[in-house]
Curated annotation (Swiss-Prot):
GO MF annotations in UniProt: rRNA binding; structural constituent of ribosome
Any Gene Ontology CC annotation: cytosolic small ribosomal subunit
Pfam families: Ribosomal_S15
Organism lineage: Bacteria, Bacillati, Mycoplasmatota, Mycoplasmoidales, Metamycoplasmataceae
Family: Belongs to the universal ribosomal protein uS15 family.
Native species: Mycoplasmopsis synoviae (strain 53) (Mycoplasma synoviae)
Subunit structure: Part of the 30S ribosomal subunit. Forms a bridge to the 50S subunit in the 70S ribosome, contacting the 23S rRNA.
A biological process term (GO) from this entry: translation
Keywords for this protein: Ribonucleoprotein, Ribosomal protein, RNA-binding, rRNA-binding
Name of this protein: Small ribosomal subunit protein uS15
Function statement: One of the primary rRNA binding proteins, it binds directly to 16S rRNA where it helps nucleate assembly of the platform of the 30S subunit by binding and bridging several RNA helices of the 16S rRNA. Forms an intersubunit bridge (bridge B4) with the 23S rRNA of the 50S subunit in the ribosome.
C-alpha cells in the first residue's frame, strides 16, 4: 500500500498539478510504484494466493490504463513505457 506522502510526491512529479490524480499517466505511476513495492513480498511468500489476487488486479488495471493511453495518446504511452521501464 502506498502512503499519503509517497502518493503526493508521485502526483506532483507526474501530474500537471498536485491534485491531478485522475490523469492516466499519474494512475500508471501510482500502480507501478505499488506493484514494485509488492514484488519482494511475493518472492518471499510464494504461497500467499489471497494477496496475489489483489496484486494481479493491480497489474490488470495498469495494463488497461496503458491500453487506453496507447489508443488515445500514443506519445504519452511511449513516455510512460520509457519512464517506468515497462515492456510492450
Amino acid at each position: 500500500m502506498i502512503s499519503k506522502q509517497e502518493k503526493k510526491l508521485l502526483v506532483k512529479k507526474y501530474g500537471k498539478n498536485e491534485k491531478d490524480t485522475g490523469n492516466a499517466f499519474v494512475q500508471v505511476a501510482l500502480l507501478t510504484h505499488d506493484i514494485e513495492k509488492l514484488k519482494p513480498h511475493f518472492q518471499a511468500n510464494p504461497k500467499d494466493f489471497h494477496s496475489r489476487r489483489g496484486f494481479l488486479a493491480k497489474i490488470t488495471q495498469r495494463k488497461t490504463l496503458l491500453a487506453y493511453l496507447k489508443k488515445n495518446d500514443p506519445e504519452t504511452y511511449l513516455k510512460c513505457l520509457e519512464e517506468f521501464k515497462l515492456r510492450k
